[in-house]
Amino acid sequence: MSMSDQKNWHMMVLANPMVSLLILGSVIGAILVEISYPLPEYLLYSGLEQGQYLRLITPIFLHFGLMHLAFNSIWLAMLGSTIEQQQGSIHLLLLVVACGAVSNMVQFNWSGSMYFGGMSGVIYALLGYLWVRHKLRPASYAPLPNGIMLFMVGWLLFCMTGVLELALGIAVANAAHLSGLISGLVLGVMFAFIGPKKSSD
């Protein structure tokens, strides 16, 4: 890596500290999955009745394989950095915690299994949040690149058919993805109307 590349990475981390911490957490989660399988219970989802509220969130950091980690990290860097630079690190963290908890709870109650993980539910939440914020208040966020929303919703619907699981044995947390998207849309609508308006709105 050249000096200019190192400088660019350093500047990116400084500009997006929360995104960087979330990606670091995902890397650590992926390593723990690799070295601790079967996964220790404290990393997995636990319902509210257990009183261990942190475990409502911890599954978002668990990733199963390099592709799973890389795919989610790229999307998180792209979508999360947009929100963090526009509204700050705390705002992004609150979105991640709220939507992560919702998507994890829905996935657990839908599947009945606590053996799931990944940042994908949060990714769909951030996608929905950015999309609806731009639609309702265009001055607050730039539009998503052409075709991204269509591609991601199409991928969600394709995964829900069960083809991947039947053909490749890849289990997909469809309930987490769908509930993440919906929660992001809902929060996007809420913040579009309660946030400070710009003169160009």
Residue ranges with predicted function:
Residues 2-201:
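A detector for small-residue-rich transmembrane helices and their helix-helix packing motifs
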